Amino acid sequence: MFAQSFIITALAALAVASPLQVRTSDKCNTGTVHCCNSMKKSDSADISKIASLLQLDVKGVVGDVGLQCSPLVSLVGGGSKCSGQTVCCDQTKFNGLVNIGCSPINVGL
C-alpha cells in the first residue's frame, strides 16, 4: 500500500512541477513572419490612398496589409519580441513600410 501511495504522490508531484508550454510555430506556410505596428483591411480607404501614392496594386489581396513592419527574428534563449501585431505576410514592399497579404499568427504562447 505504501509503494502504491508513493508512486501516485510522485506522479502527482511530477505533473505539478512540469510547466505546461503551448507553442505555436513561428514560421509561415508561405511568406515570412513580421512584427507590424499597424494592420489595415486591404480594401480600407487608408490603404487605397497609400497604395495609390506608392503605386501598389492591392486589388484582390487575400489578407490584411501591415504597415511599418520588421522581420521577426528569434532572440537567442528568449524567443521573439513584438510590441505590435505578429503576422505572416506574402509580400514586403519598401523595406517593410507596407506588407501585403498578412494574416495574424501567435508566436511562443
Swiss-Prot record:
Transmembrane segments: none
Molecular functions (GO terms): structural constituent of cell wall
Subunit comment: Self-assembles to form functional amyloid fibrils called rodlets. Self-assembly into fibrillar rodlets occurs spontaneously at hydrophobic:hydrophilic interfaces and the rodlets further associate laterally to form amphipathic monolayers.
UniProt-annotated location(s): Secreted; Secreted, Cell wall
Biological source species: Pleurotus ostreatus (strain PC15)
GO cellular component assignments: extracellular region; fungal-type cell wall
Biological role stated in the UniProt entry: Aerial growth, conidiation, and dispersal of filamentous fungi in the environment rely upon a capability of their secreting small amphipathic proteins called hydrophobins (HPBs) with low sequence identity. Class I can self-assemble into an outermost layer of rodlet bundles on aerial cell surfaces, conferring cellular hydrophobicity that supports fungal growth, development and dispersal; whereas Class II form highly ordered films at water-air interfaces through intermolecular interactions but contribute nothing to the rodlet structure.
Keyword tags: Cell wall, Disulfide bond, Secreted, Signal
Main localization category: secreted
Name of the featured protein: Class I hydrophobin 7
Disulphide bonds in the chain: C28-C88, C35-C82, C36-C69, C89-C102
Gene: Hydph7
InterPro entries linked to this entry: Hydrophobin, Hydrophobin_CS
SMART domains: HYDRO
CDD domains: hydrophobin_I (cd23507)
Signal peptide start-end: 1-17
Family, per entry: Belongs to the fungal hydrophobin family.
